[in-house]
């Protein structure tokens, strides 16, 4: 079992700009080489701005290259709850932003000829309790009326047409969702930035930032750059201004990839061929790959990714995979990895300005499509275009007890596992 991301291991190599070419001044510095930063850098070049992207390690080496491979539309939580919490108009508007984000990814793939197995496969959100069924039905009715007439509610034997499993009693199909190879997309996006004239420097962290007349002085180990504008797209990074770190809770998400299987086997286990997300408090998500592997992930451990946690999580995920898909043959796990999700208190992303510095982050597990979309929107804002940020004006509270919060994550995880156990005892 390789303790590395399948996406990163099987992505093509990428050659960044030589360190000697670090310029003295540019229109924009983008900090962070994930999908947000790369998308912003490409859009900035399209709008005529000179741009340097600084990445502490390797492009798409963190969350962008360590996720489950889904490009899903729909909110992270319940649409019905969002309507009650923020009002129907705001919830509907946000839902449509997520839809537009999936469209944006597809457009970027097409316009830049990125070979990444992009496919509109749809998402299936499944429940195994009567409470789940009621919640899915409520969301279905609300979505049909307000935001997405394409969603479809299924139950009973209809489930078996999607999954060969007796575990689930209901599901909601989101046809607009997609999937792709994250590593190949990320490298293709980075190559597109370079081809457009942008500069990318890997292993080049931002070590300081000072505001000055007409812009910002950004420090790196390889020199300083003056930029008219700076975009922070750093997600769960432990570095950079503390204002951002105090508002992000890094939560580990862990994933395994099986060895390749016979295509017929996967089709029998997952005849619907969709991205699948479960509704348990400790939920799982899974999908097939173009080379007939099963990618299966979840919050197996409520701690940050590291070697010991990744190994333990891999064994837990294998057990969960067998419970969830009992028809799956005794297949081996070839890859196991973890990554950190940049959670906000309400699981909604944030984008705007702080002390003149632009930012976009906090995608809370729904980052693939939103990071690409928001990278473009923030690039447009940095270029002087108005009304481009759909997340403008949203307050961003600190994580309560930020310094201690990570120590309580295992307790939170134990609570939700116990809650799942009790709920599963229902008749």
Model-derived features with residue positions:
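Glycine-rich FAD pyrophosphate-binding loop
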Residues: 46-66
């Amino acid at each position: 079992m390789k303790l590395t991301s399948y996406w990163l291991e099987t992505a093509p190599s990428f050659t960044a700009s030589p360190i000697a070419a670090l310029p003295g001044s540019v229109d924009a510095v983008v900090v962070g080489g994930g999908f947000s930063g790369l998308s912003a850098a490409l859009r900035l070049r399209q709008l005529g701005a000179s741009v340097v992207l600084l990445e502490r390690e390797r492009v798409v080496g963190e969350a962008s290259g360590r996720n489950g491979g889904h490009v899903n539309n729909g909110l992270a939580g319940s649409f019905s709850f969002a309507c009650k919490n923020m009002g129907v108009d705001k919830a509907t508007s946000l839902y449509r932003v997520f839809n537009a984000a999936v469209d944006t990814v597809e457009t970027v793939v097409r316009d830049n000829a990125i070979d990444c197995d992009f496919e509109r496969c749809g998402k299936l959100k499944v429940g195994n309790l009567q409470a789940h069924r009621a919640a899915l039905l409520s969301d279905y009715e609300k979505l049909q009326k307000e935001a997405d007439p394409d969603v479809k509610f299924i139950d009973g034997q209809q489930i078996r047409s999607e999954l060969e499993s007796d575990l689930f009693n209901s599901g909601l199909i989101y046809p607009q969702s997609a999937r792709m190879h994250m590593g190949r997309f990320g490298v293709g996006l980075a190559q597109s930035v370079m081809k457009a004239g942008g500069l990318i420097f890997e292993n080049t962290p931002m070590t300081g930032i000072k505001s000055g007349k007409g812009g910002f002085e950004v420090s790196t180990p390889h020199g300083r750059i003056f930029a008219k504008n700076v975009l922070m797209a750093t997600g769960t990074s432990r570095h950079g201004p503390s204002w951002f770190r105090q508002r992000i809770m890094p939560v580990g998400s862990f994933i395994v990839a099986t060895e390749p299987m016979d295509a017929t086997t996967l089709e029998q286990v997952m005849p619907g061929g969709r991205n699948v997300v479960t509704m348990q408090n400790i939920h799982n998500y899974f999908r097939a790959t173009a080379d007939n592997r099963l990618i299966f992930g979840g919050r197996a451990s409520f701690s940050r990714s590291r070697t010991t946690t990744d190994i333990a999580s891999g064994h837990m995920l294998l057990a969960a995979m067998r419970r969830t898909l009992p028809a799956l043959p005794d297949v081996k796990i070839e890859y196991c990895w973890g990554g950190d999700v940049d959670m906000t208190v309400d699981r909604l992303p944030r984008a705007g300005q702080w002390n003149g510095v632009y930012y976009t982050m906090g995608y809370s597990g729904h980052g693939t499509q939103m990071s690409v979309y928001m990278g473009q929107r923030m690039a447009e804002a940095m270029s002087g275009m108005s009304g481009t940020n759909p997340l403008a004006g949203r307050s961003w509270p600190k994580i309560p007890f930020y310094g201690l919060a990570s120590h309580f994550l295992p307790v939170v995880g134990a609570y939700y596992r116990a809650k799942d156990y009790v709920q599963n005892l229902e008749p």
